[in-house]
Amino acid sequence: MKKKIESYQGAAGGWGAVKSVANAVRKQMDIRQDVIAMFDMNKPEGFDCPGCAWPDPKHSASFDICENGAKAIAWEVTDKQVNASFFAENTVQSLLTWGDHELEAAGRLTQPLKYDDVSDCYKPLSWQQAFDEIGARLQSYSDPNQVEFYTSGRTSNEAAFLYQLFAREYRSNNFPDCSNMCHEPTSVGLAASIGVGKGTVLLEDFEKCDLVICIGHNPGTNHPRMLTSLRALVKRGAKMIAINPLQERGLERFTAPQNPFEMLTNSETQLASAYYNVRIGGDMALLKGMMRLLIERDDAASAAGRPSLLDDEFIQTHTVGFDELRRDVLNSEWKDIERISGLSQTQIAELADAYAAAERTIICYGMGITQHEHGTQNVQQLVNLLLMKGNIGKPGAGICPLRGHSNVQGDRTVGITEKPSAEFLDRLCERYGFTPPHAPGHAAIASMQAICTGQARALICMGGNFALAMPDREASAVPLTQLDLAVHVATKLNRSHLLTARHSYILPVLGRSEIDMQKSGAQAVTVEDSMSMIHASRGVLKPAGVMLKSECAVVAGIAQAALPQSVVAWEYLVEDYDRIRNDIEAVLPEFADYNQRIRHPGGFHLINAAAERRWMTSSGKANFITSKGLLEDPSSAFNSKLVMATVRSHDQYNTTIYGMDDRYRGVFGQRDVVFMSAKQAKICRVKNGERVNLIALTPDGKRSSRRMDRLKVVIYPMADRSLVTYFPESNHMLTLDNHDPLSGIPGYKSIPVELEPSN
């Protein structure tokens, strides 16, 4: 693997994407059979991409797949296997020395495994033995709240519903979830602002908008199929503006792999009409600057007898809190706005002008907005900006959070939450006849804190790589090994499985692409995309191993063993997933006619009250919510210090590392790098390719023991006073205390650091 730093000249997509897909397929898949499966991905009679949550178009192409979707499916359907013979040759201690890419690249898990501390190896056991032993451990705990039930966003609606049902009959609301680490500020912030913790737009709105503002996200890597929608809106004359600390190729220009003309002529579509490199942690200052300009210009228009710049009728009829917001933003000083955002008043005025001129605006955002100590307030400032011009609840306008995992939104909809509503719990009671717990449980940060303090005794993970995804993994690694029980439901080996508890199990499950055969026949599961569309997913491939079970079957097996007197007919439900969906419909009225509607091509849309200008808030209206000050990360407020954000590489999806390249950013064969601007490198007196150390700072600005040594400097077009490193390697630079108090999300995108040359 050749290591090099070399500027990539191509557009996003194009032949570079095609070559990358070909390499992924060649290295992982049985071409004779499995490539055919890609033609069934994201199709009504096929399976949903296990990657991102971008919605499927109503009229999809014959090959509706993106580069990273192809990598995800190649990773899943690999013909490599991790079985008993693999573990006979590799102890857990030896596997801990492997890289995270190497661990998952070893192949698919194909049989139930139990850790044996004498041999330091995982050894096979029968499914029933695994269920019985896990059930016995769960029965032994005096307090159900000693168990943490983690969920990954790849889990289907059906499996997630059964999982929460099991945990609540067990009498726990401990539901740490991957969304706690990515879009929890969306769920919390939007619910408070507009009454719905989800986005308000549909894919069709991109066909009607005048302007799309993309802030804090990187579609070329994290949701590449979005580029097709951005290309289409630019082609018809609408504008897209990008706001991001780094210049990301997927926001700049795109060659559509499905477009023969662009591919054959090497032509491309310019996406962003303007690009603003806001400093890391400067979004709130920028947004308040935009709102201040809009209000001042609206006041001037009013005084001159010109038409209002804002939507006064909408503000008066549909909102509360505007006067308080107005006072706050008008009191924000320009010198502070410019210093914190890194943008001049002139640049911010350009943004405000573009927004003022557009009749219909969509704001798309990702974790660059949410993963801050004030991530919830960040989201709410985006809503404030939209509300000022009535851009919620009309065609071609709205808020568009870009979710990660393909069903992370659906899991929450069907009950994966540590704070369930009383109405939801009452309906569970009515349907099943047991009284679920009402006290709030643990989200991700509280869950890890409970593990670190010894309060938690067991961890069950429905997918994911919990230990690697969390902050401060050095502090949490030993407590994880001191748990009494760890159960990992997974398709591939990862580092979390190697931090073995007293009793550790790995339970292998089917992938999204594989046929799920139950007593009534082949089953479909359902997922919810970022725009609240529910659709079916049906595996088409032969399972990787004869012993694999579905997630639904695994949940039912554990539940039956742990709850011998259960009132739930677990086996009956798993025989036919229509029965699970009937129960979901009974508990959640918005799923009316669930089984009928998922049989329609494309599925159905869950009602979004805010999109219809029905405000399910305590005020009965949309709320302008003021956030005091301009800092979205108070612990980073040291003027002389650098701020570091963690990001994915292009060969990566969440904690899964497909390869060692980051093509669009020009990094190949390596991940031990730190990105900085040429201006910042000059200030720090370092050059491209030199090695440096980063030291994390405490909240009072002192050097901590958390550090990253010998990172290679990569000079990159980006904001100054900002550094970027790769997730999850840099997660340990953040403590469990560095999180948003409203949503609990860790501040992965704003870690104060110092830089020094490496010896």
From Swiss-Prot:
Obligatory cofactor(s): [4Fe-4S] cluster; Mo-bis(molybdopterin guanine dinucleotide)
Ligand binding ([4Fe-4S] cluster): 49, 52
GO cellular component: membrane
Details of cofactor binding: Binds 1 [4Fe-4S] cluster.
Induction (record text): By EvgA.
Pfam families: Molybdopterin
Designated name of the protein: Protein YdeP
